[in-house]
């Protein structure tokens, strides 16, 4: 933890150079005694003398987590933002890593947590009228496939589609992976944009809503899809076993379908339990996406667009 109360009851930041180890400090959550620690690996921080009675803070914070919180805090302060670090939200029974203005929580997530816990924490913020942005550390970065947990970190806007945020301590940057699409075998495609942590972070976080340029990219779809599905079925892949069963119930066999029957192979990501961070209905955009491809000729090259493009195409047809 980076914040504590001093003997006068004022909140102090561990990063302040004037603090002394011999002084007495307490946890703003449980009021228990905390100690100021300095190390060669971790930045200055406070640690509980005994954690038994604290329901707010944990002692398993990594050096990455502490350093990223500190870097974000310094950047926001330098750009004149009203920001609190490790703000105790007693009505929610939780702590926001950073709280900007009156309604935005920033959560630095460097390790895995249960999907249920993520859903609970996110819903608590939403029910209290707060917005939350989860910023992912290295262990949770998106690579070739979306894990179930990563799906629960996805955000969506009409301008850049599905996206998520990452933090890179080594490069000292915040990274946006956006226009995220997923093919029928689970491979993901996306664009990447990065900013230095010294830039105006609030301007950065507004980018998904204010992006003006329509960005696109092309992907190549697989050939002989039924052969790939056959391998997946032989390997007892649960996803394809379920899809084949659904096809049988409709009197179909996936292995008898052509590549054209699977067009387009690259589509919007899906979540069987429902997306945690996305509160708006995506049904309209999904419908527009399908309508667009129903009118397209089959091709192994697929161009991926932001959701606003499909809406614009449909509007042009009616005008």
Regions found by a protein language model. Name each.
Residues 72, 96-114, 125:
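Conserved catalytic cores of phosphodiester-cleaving nucleases, focusing on short active-site segments
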Residues 91-93, 141-142:
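Short secondary-structure capping/turn micro-motifs that flank functional sites
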Residues 154-319:
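Non-catalytic C-terminal interaction segments of nucleic acid-processing enzymes
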């Amino acid at each position: 933890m980076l914040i504590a109360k001093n003997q006068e009851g004022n909140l102090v930041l561990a990063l302040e150079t004037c603090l002394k180890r011999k002084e007495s400090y307490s946890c703003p959550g449980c009021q228990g005694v905390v100690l100021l620690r300095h190390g060669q690996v971790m930045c200055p921080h406070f640690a509980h003398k005994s954690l038994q009675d604290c329901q707010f803070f944990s002692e398993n914070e990594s050096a990455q987590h502490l350093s990223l919180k500190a870097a974000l805090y310094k950047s926001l302060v330098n750009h004149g933002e009203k920001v609190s670090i490790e703000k105790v939200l007693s009505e929610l029974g939780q702590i926001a890593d950073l709280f900007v203005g009156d309604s935005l929580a920033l959560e630095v997530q460097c390790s895995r947590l249960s999907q249920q816990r993520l859903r609970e924490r996110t819903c608590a913020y939403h029910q209290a009228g707060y917005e939350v942005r989860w910023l992912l550390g290295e262990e949770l970065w998106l690579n070739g496939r979306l894990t179930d947990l990563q799906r629960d970190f996805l955000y969506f806007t009409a301008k850049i589609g599905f996206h998520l945020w990452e933090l890179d301590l080594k490069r000292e940057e915040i990274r946006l992976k956006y226009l995220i699409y997923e093919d029928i075998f689970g491979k993901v495609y996306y664009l990447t944009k990065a900013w230095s942590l010294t830039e105006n972070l609030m301007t950065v976080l507004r980018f998904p809503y204010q992006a003006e340029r329509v960005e696109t990219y092309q992907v190549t779809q697989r050939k002989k899809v039924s052969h790939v599905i056959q391998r997946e079925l032989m390997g007892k892949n649960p996803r394809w076993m379920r899809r084949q069963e659904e096809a049988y119930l409709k009197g179909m066999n996936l292995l008898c379908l052509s590549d054209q029957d699977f067009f387009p192979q690259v589509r919007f990501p899906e979540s069987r339990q429902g997306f945690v961070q996305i509160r708006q209905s995506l049904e309209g955009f999904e419908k527009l996406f399908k309508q667009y491809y129903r009118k397209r000729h089959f091709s192994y090259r697929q161009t991926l667009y932001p959701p606003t493009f499909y809406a614009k195409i449909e509007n042009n047809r009616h005008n």
